[in-house]
């Protein structure tokens, strides 16, 4: 697969059932039975970049997507997921903790694109991304929902560590 040509991401925000799934925002009830044919049709059509986040359905989205991606060769799937500051735990490094939880969920040793989901504290949450890239747990990093000043600051913080901001 030519990863440089990936320009369509399939989002999974509405995946999951009940109050922590698609019901909360979208009013839908998409579980594994409804989503398996969607995933397979996308895969057959050559779509492979999947965007999710731990906060989507409080894990439901990642778990559903992981159930499907485990059946595919890892090199055929691009996983994009996010660190969401508002649900960060009390660990010494909440960014790494959330990333490790996503890695375990997907049964993989790397995430293709890892995002800071929103700009709650650019100075606090951006530096740990560089460590994740350097460790090999994350291939590329991005920021989501940041304004221009926050994007510039995140870019500078990462550049100081020798890491590029790959997506906004």
Q: Over which residues does each language-model region extend?
A:
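Short internal beta-strands
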Residues: 80-81, 168
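Conserved beta-strand positions
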Residues: 10, 52, 81, 113-116, ...
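Feature marks short, surface-exposed loop/turn motifs that line or immediately flank catalytic pockets
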Residues: 14-17, 56, 85-87, 117-120, ...
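N-terminal binding-site loop/beta-alpha segment at the start of enzyme catalytic domains
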Residues: 1-77, 134
């Amino acid at each position: 697969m030519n990863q440089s040509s990936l320009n369509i991401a399939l989002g999974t925000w509405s995946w999951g059932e009940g109050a922590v799934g698609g019901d909360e925002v979208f009013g839908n009830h998409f579980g594994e039975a409804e989503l398996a044919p969607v995933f397979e049709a996308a895969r057959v059509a050559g779509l492979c970049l999947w965007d999710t986040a731990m906060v989507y359905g409080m894990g439901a989205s990642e778990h559903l997507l992981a159930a499907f991606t485990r059946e595919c060769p890892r090199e055929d799937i691009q996983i994009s997921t996010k660190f969401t500051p508002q649900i960060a735990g009390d660990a010494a490094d909440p960014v790494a903790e959330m990333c490790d939880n996503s890695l375990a969920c997907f049964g993989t040793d790397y995430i293709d694109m890892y995002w800071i989901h929103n700009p709650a504290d650019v100075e606090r949450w951006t530096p740990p991304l560089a460590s994740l890239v350097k460790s090999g747990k994350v291939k590329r990093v991005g920021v989501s929902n940041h304004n221009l000043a926050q994007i510039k600051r995140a870019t500078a913080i990462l550049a100081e560590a020798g890491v590029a901001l790959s997506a906004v």
